[in-house]
Amino acid sequence: MSRNRQTVYTYKANNIGRNLFSDQQKLASGNGFDRVTDSNPPIFLPLPEPAMPLSQKRLLFNETHTASANRLYRLDEEKQLRFQLGYIHDRTTRQYGSEEIYYFAQDTVHTAINRHDRLKTDCLNGEVNYEDNAASRYTRENFSFAGTWKSGVSDITGDNVIFQKIKNSQWELKNYFNQLYTKEKYTWGIRSYIRYTHLPALLTVIHRNLPVSSADNRLIATCIHRRDELNLPDNINENTYRTVTGQTYESIPTEYEEMNIDNAYTDNALYGMRKKNGVNYQLTGGFRGELSSVRQENSYSVPRYSFYTIPRIEWERTDFLLTAAATVWWNRLPKQSYSRFYAAPSLYFRYKFSPRWKMSLSGSLDESEGGIQDIYPFHYREDYRTVVKHTGKVAVTVRQLYTCYLEYKNTVKEFFWTLSASYSHNRYNLMAERNYKDGNFYLSSVERNHSSYSYALNTIGSKGVYDWNLKTSLELTLARNEGKQLNENIVQNYRYDYLRVEPKIVWAPSALFEVEYKATVSCGGSGIGKDTRLDPLWDVAQRLTLSLGFHDTDFRLSGEHFYNDLSKDQHLNTWLADVSLIHKSGKWRFTASAMNLFNKEQYRYTLYSAVQSYTSWVKLRPREFMVSVQYQW
């Protein structure tokens, strides 16, 4: 390693619940591009990724290997060239389940599932980044590629017995170029961004409603996937019979869904800025284009392009800041015979009353069209129980957002207080409809204008006592969401209310000892239609951490308590504890730790969404002991 040339090679392996994907993403820091808004590539057959309320270290059963190579060349004082190459191999298993209740207009649907997922991911990524940062100009050229191969297998039991397999890959190329010039009070430049993504995906669903053994299941699955030897077509829509080692199995319905998506996107713009008398004038003009295509039983494509200009003015003085902007768009989707011209204004004002008091106000109006996933007019199976079909119409969303913020700060007394409020109003031209029949959810869209609303109030107070080495804070959040749902052509109103309180205390009575306490107390309740009211449920999460340090040795003991209302008359308490000991000696570092000391096997919780409630469980990592030795040279 030298000043002009720096090389870093890394290899990491992990099976203790740590997510190493984020470490790889931090190395590829050049993928952040200024002033570029990229719509995410469409994914029609997603892998299962359930959201869980606990930290990943308690839930993630993984075996991960990562390797990377980074090379930096400093060509001179202004120029540098960086190469990065990385690879990730990951195997993850999850066991979880839920009991769900859907409150439809004419019926209440109960479902129950237990799942065992096995996911495998391989990812190869690379990047070349060149920067030239001279006194009067800045140049950046970034090229990156990524290939991700994912495969997920799920054994699902409950209302039905199902085997599901999803293969989901993504190959992507990106190129970003930015050239900026400055001269006195003027700044101008050009930027260009191009992305191409290919996403092949395959879904296999095998319905196993017969009580056959697990060994028989594995044998049947092996036979089904060897279609070429059985001389069967790729798409099996009828019951297929298997005969293995002289035994005849009952009929096993099997479904296949194969979709190949291509998505190309570009954003190119010219921009300029001038500063005069404390006022900053900015103007941006550009072109965006996107082409998405889907190959299923039929081929379907959605080209779109837009021209835009963004005038922006920023006026700043010692005690206030005023920013006004308006994005003027002309959007065109020729295949859908859709074109629209509109403006999206925004305003931000900040005023400082005194060194301690500050307030701000903001408001914005924005409009957007849905992607190919919202337009695609052919039905497809998203997973083992979800079938999707849209109208082919362009989904348009108009958003209004208003916020207010007030702050008080007294540094001498270590007291801080903030108050913020927000209001959001969204208007839609299409309404999503969800129906349930024969174990399947059918999702579609219907042309119907409707609106949704959300209100939020948040306040944070913090007080410290320097002489006591004490820091305290309290956060309070109130929120309400209102909207509509459609089921069997009947519209229902729904409302969801939410309360959250978060106290936190950090106390260090001596240089050797520290206590930290943090809690989250939340309550949510829903109202659906005129007659359905869901009981408010309380959830409490508390964490207490005791830290003791003596010379080169640190000891930490942490405990967590979770209280969850599963229903009006049933609740659950869960206790978790961890301990660790770290000793440093010169360049050596010795660590011993134990996780989940009480060896809890499962965590359960109940949550509400807008029109449903679900009680879920998830398998926890068992009691684990770990010893590590590190040496730094």
Model segments located where?
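Solvent-exposed loop/turn segments connecting transmembrane beta-strands
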Residues: M1-N4, A135, L333-S339, D366, ...
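Outer-membrane beta-barrel domain signature
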Residues: L54-L60, I113-L119, I162-N168, E255-I261, ...
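Face-selective signature of the C-terminal outer-membrane beta-barrel domain
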Residues: T64-D90, D117-K335, K352, F415-Y423, ...
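Membrane-embedded beta-barrel scaffold of Gram-negative outer-membrane proteins
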Residues: V396-Y442, S451-Y453, V465-T477
